[in-house]
Amino acid sequence: SVALCLEDTIADSAVGQALEQLGNTFKTLHLAFATHDVTLPKIFVRVRNPEQISVVYQKISCFDELFSGFIFPKYSLANADEYNSEFLKVLSQSSKQFYMMPILESEDIVDYATRPSVLIQLKQKIDDMKDHVLNVRVGGNDFSNAFGVRRHIDETIYDILPVSQLLCDILTVFSRDYVVSGPVWEYYSSNNDEWAIGLKRELKYDVLNGFVGKTVIHPNQIPVVVDSL
């Protein structure tokens, strides 16, 4: 699958331009798909907030055959109902099955005192949409930022114990019922391929702990991930 991101890669001042580019991208893909023998991945749009779901769909609704669904960043108790409701509104406007991929990365999961309750309530929100949930994702960098830490190129997310424990709690609650993908590895270039060695090391622990797949942010990462899974 591939994600077209309208969230943290886009400045507030550029949202309108990004939406126009999104529409143009789908037009280009539609023409390529119609005139060439090409295989496309499942294409998802990562929205900024629940309100943007309907705006995005209006832009690309005529390209239903290319579009697989939405990614919901910072899915939390504060916005889960709105995300779910807006998604169902879009779903009711199409005869095609769309999917959602919530990202668990919000501050309310970080607080250890409330984490168990929050995770259980979040699972209930996601269970309400179970037939439409293709994947549950996690925000490793957001969690690291919350603790004021960052893994280096020769370390894995599992070396950061507070984050590792948090990811473990998410897997404990969700992995028996959902596919949960591993967190982003932020390195994709270095001398002597240290970044690839580090990514392979982290992928080993991802698989060991029950993550399925890995979010990539650069084409260099794709063959490393594919070869390791």
Segments from the language model and where they lie:
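Expand to "…catalyze enediolate/carbanion chemistry for C-C bond making/breaking, isomerization
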Residues: 1-229
